[in-house]
């Protein structure tokens, strides 16, 4: 424990949740997608399962990022106009950044995979389609792995905000 630093429950929730979100997101790239690649030899199965995985992730992960950013925002209110409070706000912004990153960096790949999933039954047995599907999924893995780092970066930023001292903390003896 850092000398003079006693995190509140809200700090612990923000940090743990940010790290959890990052790990949950990265596990999709590190565990789930390799499983899909190993068990699907046709583009129809691969792209259809990717689309379902994406659907469930798109429901859960952005909602979690909004909730975590709100907790960081609340944590920032425990500091007066100080660098610690600004770091907590930056942590929330980094956590929320998964949405604009998706829009700016991933939409073309996502759309190509969705289009392939919609027409995948017509690709059965076509080697070119199989390679294209696998290449698109692997590109998505790289992009998603980068996106997965954002909540972790937020947690690191949040940790620096809450661990850099108690000066400015509302209710502290300073």
UniProtKB/Swiss-Prot annotation:
It comes from Claviceps purpurea (strain 20.1) (Ergot fungus). The chain crosses the membrane at residues 13-33, 56-76, 88-108, 140-160. Anthrone oxygenase; part of the ergochrome gene cluster responsible for the typical purple-black color of the ergot sclerotia. The ergochrome gene cluster produces several ergot pigments including the yellow ergochrome secalonic acid and its derivatives, as well as the red anthraquinones endocrocin and clavorubin. The pathway begins with the synthesis of atrochrysone thioester by the polyketide synthase (PKS) CPUR_05437. The atrochrysone carboxyl ACP thioesterase CPUR_05436 then breaks the thioester bond and releases the atrochrysone carboxylic acid from CPUR_05437. This is Anthrone oxygenase CPUR_05435. Induction: Expression correlates with the formation of the sclerotia and thus the pigment production and is directly regulated by the cluster-specific activator CPUR_05433. It is found in: Membrane. It is an enzyme of class 1 (oxidoreductase). Belongs to the anthrone oxygenase family.
């Amino acid at each position: 424990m850092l000398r003079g630093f006693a995190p509140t429950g809200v700090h612990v929730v923000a940090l743990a949740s940010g790290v959890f979100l990052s790990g949950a997101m990265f596990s999709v790239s590190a565990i789930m997608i390799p499983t899909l690649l190993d068990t699907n030899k046709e583009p129809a199965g691969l792209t259809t399962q990717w689309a379902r995985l994406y659907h469930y992730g798109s429901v859960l992960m952005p909602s979690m990022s909004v909730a975590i950013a709100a907790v960081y925002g609340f944590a920032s209110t425990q500091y007066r106009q100080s660098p610690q409070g600004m770091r907590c706000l930056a942590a929330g912004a980094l956590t929320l950044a998964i949405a604009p990153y998706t829009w700016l960096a991933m939409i073309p790949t996502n759309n190509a995979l969705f289009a392939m999933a919609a027409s995948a039954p017509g690709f059965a047995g076509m080697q070119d389609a199989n390679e294209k599907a696998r290449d698109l999924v692997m590109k998505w893995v790289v992009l998603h792995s980068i996106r997965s780092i954002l909540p972790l970066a937020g947690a690191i930023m949040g940790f620096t905000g809450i661990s850099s001292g108690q000066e400015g903390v509302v209710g502290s003896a300073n």
